[in-house]
Amino acid sequence: MTQATLIWCHGSLSQPWGDKSKALSEIAANAGLTLDAPDFQSMENPDDRVEFLVESLQDAPGPVILTGSSMGGYVAAAAAKQLDVAGLFLLAPAFYLPGYAIHVFSNLPETISVVHGWQDDVVDVDGSIRFSKQHRADLHILPDGHRLSESIPTIGTLFSHFLEKFTGQE
């Protein structure tokens, strides 16, 4: 079986290799996967990021698994409309915001996990609740803010369980 292509989409003001992506990369490595993190810092428009991601993954080997935080969560879900994606793991995704082109998501995989903080003052948790309800996603709401910095160990556990669906490891 071909190894999955695992991609991290960072948020608007973030960099590719912050605390969350480093933690998820380590968990992915333990599962035998490599997490790649494209650099979107030169692209302010989220839909430019979507276009870039879709173009870069057109010929990706194996199943494609997209992960992302905030704007990166939106980018991952929006790109899934145009790609054959096996799974989405989204942290505080920026859904249903003004200025973002896509508000109706389709062609999404069955395996979707969404993590959001109750105290998020940047992206309202209601968007994650709405999205998760519409797409039957696993939803985890944690006592944390937008960055989810206090919840990285919990997110790591959730990500490990999420990846088990693709690696067969338990």
What are these regions (language model features)?
Residues T2-P61:
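Active-site catalytic motif of lipid deacylating hydrolases and related acyltransferases
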Residues W17, D121-G127:
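Conserved alpha/beta-hydrolase "acid-adjacent" motif
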Residues K22, D126, S149-K165:
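Post-His helix in hydrolase/transferase enzymes
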Residues G32, K133-S149:
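Catalytic histidine neighborhood in serine/cysteine hydrolases
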Residues I65-L66, L88:
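Conserved alpha/beta-hydrolase fold motif
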Residues T67-A77:
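Gly/Ala-rich beta-loop-alpha elbow adjacent to hydrolase catalytic centers
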Residues D84-Y96:
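A conserved short beta-strand
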Residues L108-P109, S113-H116, D120:
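Short beta-strand/loop motif that positions the catalytic acidic residue
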